[in-house]
Amino acid sequence: MKYKDLRDFIAQLEQSGQLKRISREIDPYLEMTEISDRTLRAGGPALLFENPKGYTMPVLTNLFGTPDRVAMGMGQPNVAALRQVGIWLSYLKEPEPPRGFKELMEKLPIFKQVLNMPTKRLSSAPCQQRVLEGEAVDLDQIPIQHCWPGDVAPLVTWGLTITRGPYKKRQNLGIYRQQKIGKNKLIMRWLDHRGGAIDFREWQEAHPGERFPVVVALGADPATILGAVTPVPDTLSEYAFAGLLRGSRTEVVKAVSCDLEVPASAEIVLEGYLEPGEMAPEGPYGDHTGYYNEVDEFPVFTITHMTMRKDAIYHSTYTGRPPDEPAVLGVALNEVFVPLLQKQFPEIVDFYLPPEGCSYRMAVVTIKKRYPGHAKRVMLGVWSFLRQFMYTKFVIVCDDDINARDWKDVIWAITTRMDPARDTTLIEHTPIDYLDFASPVSGLGSKMGLDATNKWPGETNREWGQPIVQDEAVKQKIDALWDELNILG
């Protein structure tokens, strides 16, 4: 099912028992986090806090708190169907013309979906029902969560940051956390390789000293939100991909203060600029690693205009030790990554990012091994193929008889098919998430590859063990007798 806006999605969730309204007064300071965390860990519903302490604006959390709700938001019936989204992305990343009528018919659904990718620009929109500017801009009107006791200030977590660089026609949408430091100021925490940071860097090169226009949208429709966290090709706007997911063109409206386009159905829109050279210390904050991060400097976002619906809803989340909402997103988006990797490496059978590993710091890959050294080629490919895996510290490669998603299977392969000296690959001085305080230098560390495959001639001179497998005829005979034996009661 497709959803025209966030409210349509909320209504469908409520109808199916996947949204809980909380009318009791709950404090955005710590209390919402504790309730949301307990609910998410229990696989519970999305939460709509209707009476935040000190505010009149309701707060929506845990929207994507289960993998199935992520799939729903992407217009798919279940998590397994997200493989289709990965197939679309692999085609968009490297499109190939059909080689005949049969292949044309096979690709026709993709071609039809591509027609929904251009945006539809409106002259007016719900997100601009109220317009505040200048002194009237006041972030204190928004019940921004203060998630953890050691957090330095309230934190905007689900803002879709919209930018455009000087050399690209497409707009970039990214989700970067933003620390509140004043009534009209936030700190824009983005890493150097992210689209918004690249746009800002190129802007400063092309327009030195000039202010960089930025818009942050809160509470967009689910396809647009999830498009911003999906690994779309660099040449494609997340708006275009959202249209493909939704099956209808993304409706946008021109921002009040600049030429950037904002989601027409968004609940709240913050418009403003980054002043070159204006930086501020960000953090510490409790993060998806389960620790408080170090303080570092990032650009300051000055808000000149705040537009919103008349009865706006604030969409929020928290991050902490997995499972949290980003970890749940990681579980669902894992299915999107598989077809992308398989197009480049057809020998890959499965690919798994364990949520316990922060959903990106460790990967388990199973392959149909074809030659000596094959596992090392795959691990190097994983690190270099998609930007999303540049911070993956550990890659474990196993044969296709191993279930990548079963730790008992994976550990058995590691302990029976690996020699630590021969089968471990260490690479130093590689990009590492700056939040990873275990690395010796901020932003620079090492990677480890583990070849847990069966070894071929050339990789070992020893006779290799054969796995124990029961005789199939005996298994079938005992299957027929099992209930009669009544061993387990």
Swiss-Prot record:
Entry cofactors: prenylated FMN; Mn(2+)
Binding site for Mn(2+): 172, 238
Location(s), subcellular: Cell membrane
EC number in record: 4.1.1.98
Residues at the active site: 287 (proton donor)
UniProtKB keywords: Cell membrane, Decarboxylase, Flavoprotein, FMN, Lyase, Manganese, Membrane, Metal-binding, Ubiquinone biosynthesis
Residue sites binding prenylated FMN per the record: 175-177, 189-191, 194-195
Main location: membrane
Pathway: Cofactor biosynthesis; ubiquinone biosynthesis
Any one annotated GO CC term: cytosol
Any one GO biological process: ubiquinone biosynthetic process
Record Pfam families: UbiD, UbiD_C, UbiD_N
Membrane-topology annotation of the record: Peripheral membrane protein
Known catalytic reactions: a 4-hydroxy-3-(all-trans-polyprenyl)benzoate + H(+) = a 2-(all-trans-polyprenyl)phenol + CO2
GO MF entries: 3-octaprenyl-4-hydroxybenzoate carboxy-lyase activity; metal ion binding
Note on how the cofactor is bound: Binds 1 prenylated FMN per subunit.
Biological role: Catalyzes the decarboxylation of 3-octaprenyl-4-hydroxy benzoate to 2-octaprenylphenol, an intermediate step in ubiquinone biosynthesis.
Subunit structure: Homohexamer.
Similarity comment: family membership: Belongs to the UbiD family.
NCBIfam families membership: PRK10922.1 (NF008175), UbiD family decarboxylase (TIGR00148)
Protein name: 3-octaprenyl-4-hydroxybenzoate carboxy-lyase
